């Protein structure tokens, strides 16, 4: 099944290089020998304009298994984000990434990253993954927004882009 996964991921890369949303980054990691590891992608999602996430660029790793696209990739913020739907490990809790819920093999990397960006500003409080962020989001929205704005400054787009290019 690995051949199918590798072929699909090569296509995803080709489509991404031709057309991707402004400010987003998605690229396979390079192996020590300079070849690309299509099963391990470094990505970054910009905070949407006019939201508390604006100004930040949030790094995320996508790990694909041999049975992709039958199963979704594992998406993990590195470092983990303060968000109700991000586990303390950084793993994203999103129905699109759950093969038993909304995952479909036709979903592209671009669609996933846009979906995760949308989740940042619209948490799903029915499916919390991080107790502290969930409680603060529900009980003290002003404090939650203050914490998120600090993260946006901490992960300023210019700094993260520079780190990813090194």
From Swiss-Prot:
Where does the protein end up? Answer: Nucleus envelope
| Major localization listed first in the record, in broad terms | nucleus
Q: What class of enzyme is it?
A: transferase
Which GO MF terms are attached to this record?
ATP binding; RNA polymerase II-specific DNA-binding transcription factor binding; SAM domain binding; SUMO conjugating enzyme activity
* Record-linked CDD domains: UBCc_UBE2I (cd23798)
Metabolic or biological pathway: Protein modification; protein sumoylation
Q: Does the keyword Protein transport apply?
A: no
Q: Which UniProt keywords apply?
A: ATP-binding, Developmental protein, Nucleotide-binding, Nucleus, Transferase, Ubl conjugation pathway
Query: Is tRNA processing tagged as a keyword?
Result: no
* Positions in coiled-coil regions: none
Show where the UBC core domain sits. Answer: 4-157
Q: Which residues form the active site?
A: 93
Null mutant phenotype: RNAi-mediated knockdown results in sterility, embryonic lethality and sensitivity to radiation. RNAi-mediated knockdown causes a number of defects during the first embryonic mitotic division including loss of smo-1 from metaphase chromosomes, chromosome misalignment at metaphase, diminished spindle pole separation, slow chromosome segregation, decreased distance between chromosomes afer anaphase onset and increased air-2 levels in the spindle midzone. RNAi-mediated knockdown results in ectopic tbx-2 expression in seam cells, the gut and in the syncytial hypodermis.
A biological process term (GO) from this entry? protein sumoylation
E.C. number(s) listed in UniProt: 2.3.2.-
What Gene3D superfamilies does UniProt report for this protein, alphabetically? Answer: Ubiquitin Conjugating Enzyme
Entry's Gene Ontology cellular component terms: nuclear envelope; nucleus
Query: What's the family?
Result: Belongs to the ubiquitin-conjugating enzyme family.
Q: How does it assemble?
A: Interacts with brd-1 and rad-51. Interacts with smo-1 and sop-2. Interacts with bet-1 (via BROMO domain 2). Interacts with isoforms 1 and 2 of X-box-binding protein xbp-1.
Protein name in the entry? SUMO-conjugating enzyme UBC9
- Which species does the entry assign this protein to? Caenorhabditis elegans
| Lineage, highest ranks first | Eukaryota, Metazoa, Ecdysozoa, Nematoda, Chromadorea
